[in-house]
């Protein structure tokens, strides 16, 4: 009787000491009854931005999403009216292009606004408006990077064009051709030296960051489009347009500028 109790106690203790990550089923007999001990695996919480229950582009009013948009990838809100992602190869290519253009747009939006912000706060480094800055190369003194002649000084638009084509063409050609430098790395999220802050160490946090990057990137692409339209319509930079709107919202807004192009006005 005592031996049986010791064996049962030892069996229960060994089971309790098993790691919580293991899925274990032990069966024993106690007092003529059948006892099953089971330890289940703790499920990993999933991000709300992925899977079939993720937010859709029209919220609860969204229609049935296409079967190929399963929520597997970041930024998938189930919207593809034109069917651009129906082909898997095209879908993969479009995902890559969107991430790359998002990153360029975020850098571009910063470059379009930051010089104006500095200029408004008394920092002088030449032309602050983004679409006017390049024209300084045609001036007598040429173009100084950040207004400092000791950094990069340029006076030839042809030289700038040639350097841009050669450098960017080489880099893009290398990327598209799949050079050996990036072997073994994810083409969109290489990590390592490209993640010095180790932001992608936690997989769950990394999946959230992918979504945030695309959301901000899409907003930046729309912003860049708006900056181009503003430059054509008003001839001013985005910060100056913002200041004008805040000073007189009625006279300076998209509607008032659009009506200037009405025939007969």
From Swiss-Prot:
PTM notes: Photoregulated by reversible but rapid phosphorylation by STN7 of its threonine residues under state 2 (red) light conditions. Dephosphorylated by PPH1 in state 1 (far red) light conditions. Phosphorylation triggers the formation of the PSI-LHCII supercomplex.
Effects seen without this gene: In plants silenced with microRNAs, functional LHCII thylakoid protein complexes where LHCB2 is replaced by LHCB1. However these LHCII complexes are impaired in light state transitions, leading to stunted growth in high light. Reduced reactive oxygen species (ROS) production in leaves and impaired stomatal closure in response to abscisic acid (ABA). Increased water loss and reduced resistance to drought, probably due to open stomata. Altered expression of other LHCB members.
Keyword Acetylation appears in the UniProt entry: no
Entry binding sites for chlorophyll a 1: 79, 85, 98, 218
Signal peptide (UniProt feature, chain positions): none
Modification type Phosphothreonine: residues: 40
Gene induction: Accumulates at stronger levels in low light than in normal or high light; more expressed in growth chamber conditions than when grown in the field. Repressed in leaves exposed to desiccation, cold and high irradiance via a metalloprotease-dependent proteolytic process (at protein level).
Transmembrane segments: 151-171, 219-239
Domain of life: Eukaryota
Ligand binding (chlorophyll a 6): 245, 254
Positions annotated to bind chlorophyll b 4: 164, 175
Binding annotation for chlorophyll a 2: 101
Entry's Gene Ontology molecular function annotations: chlorophyll binding; metal ion binding; mRNA binding
Cofactor, free-text remark: Binds at least 14 chlorophylls (8 Chl-a and 6 Chl-b) and carotenoids such as lutein and neoxanthin.
Residues annotated for chlorophyll b 1 binding in this entry: 57
Binding of chlorophyll a 5, residues: 212, 230
Binding site for chlorophyll b 2: 103, 152, 181
GO CC terms of this entry: chloroplast; chloroplast envelope; chloroplast thylakoid; chloroplast thylakoid membrane; mitochondrion; photosystem I; photosystem II; plant-type vacuole
Entry keywords, A to Z: Chlorophyll, Chloroplast, Chromophore, Magnesium, Membrane, Metal-binding, Phosphoprotein, Photosynthesis, Photosystem I, Photosystem II, Plastid, Thylakoid, Transit peptide, Transmembrane, Transmembrane helix
Binding-site list for chlorophyll b 3: 156, 172
Role description: The light-harvesting complex (LHC) functions as a light receptor, it captures and delivers excitation energy to photosystems with which it is closely associated. Mediates rapid phosphorylation and migration of LHCII-PSII to photosystem I (PSI) after transition to state 2 (red) light conditions, thus leading to the formation of PSI-PSII-LHCII and PSI-LHCII supercomplex to balance the relative excitation of PSI and PSII. Involved in the production of reactive oxygen species (ROS) and stomatal closure upon abscisic acid (ABA) treatment. Required to prevent water loss.
Record text on subunit structure and interactions: The LHC complex consists of chlorophyll a-b binding proteins. Component of LHCII trimers made of LHCB1, LHCB2 and LHCB3 subunits. Associated with super- (PSI-LHCII and PSII-LHCII) and mega-complexes (PSI-PSII-LHCII) containing LHCII and both photosystem (PS)I and PSII, in state 2 (red) light conditions.
Name the UniProt record assigns to this protein: Chlorophyll a-b binding protein 2.2, chloroplastic
Organism in which the protein naturally occurs: Arabidopsis thaliana (Mouse-ear cress)
Upper classification of the organism: Eukaryota, Viridiplantae, Streptophyta, Embryophyta, Tracheophyta
């Amino acid at each position: 009787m005592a031996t049986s109790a010791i064996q049962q106690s030892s069996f229960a203790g060994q089971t309790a000491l098993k790691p919580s990550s293991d899925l274990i089923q032990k069966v024993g007999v106690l007092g003529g009854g059948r006892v099953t001990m089971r330890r289940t695996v703790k499920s990993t919480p999933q991000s709300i931005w992925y899977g079939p229950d993720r937010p859709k582009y029209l919220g609860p009013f969204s229609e049935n999403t296409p079967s190929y948009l399963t929520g597997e990838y970041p930024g998938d809100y189930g919207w593809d009216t034109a069917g651009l992602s129906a082909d898997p190869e095209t879908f993969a290519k479009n995902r890559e292009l969107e991430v790359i253009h998002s990153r360029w747009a975020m850098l571009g939006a910063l470059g379009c606004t930051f010089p104006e912000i500095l200029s408004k706060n008394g920092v002088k480094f030449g032309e602050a408006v983004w679409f006017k800055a390049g024209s300084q190369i045609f001036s007598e003194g040429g173009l100084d990077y950040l207004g400092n002649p000791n950094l990069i000084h340029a006076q030839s638009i042809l030289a700038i064009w040639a350097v841009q084509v050669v450098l960017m063409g080489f880099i893009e050609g290398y990327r598209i051709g799949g050079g050996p430098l990036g072997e073994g790395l994810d083409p969109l999220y290489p990590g390592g030296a490209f993640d010095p802050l180790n932001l992608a160490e936690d997989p769950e946090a990394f999946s959230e960051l992918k979504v945030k990057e695309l959301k901000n990137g899409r907003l930046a692409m729309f912003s860049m489009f708006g900056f181009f339209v503003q430059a054509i319509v008003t001839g001013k930079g985005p910060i100056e347009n913002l200041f004008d709107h805040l000073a007189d919202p009625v006279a300076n807004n998209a509607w008032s500028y659009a009506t200037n192009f009405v025939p007969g006005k």
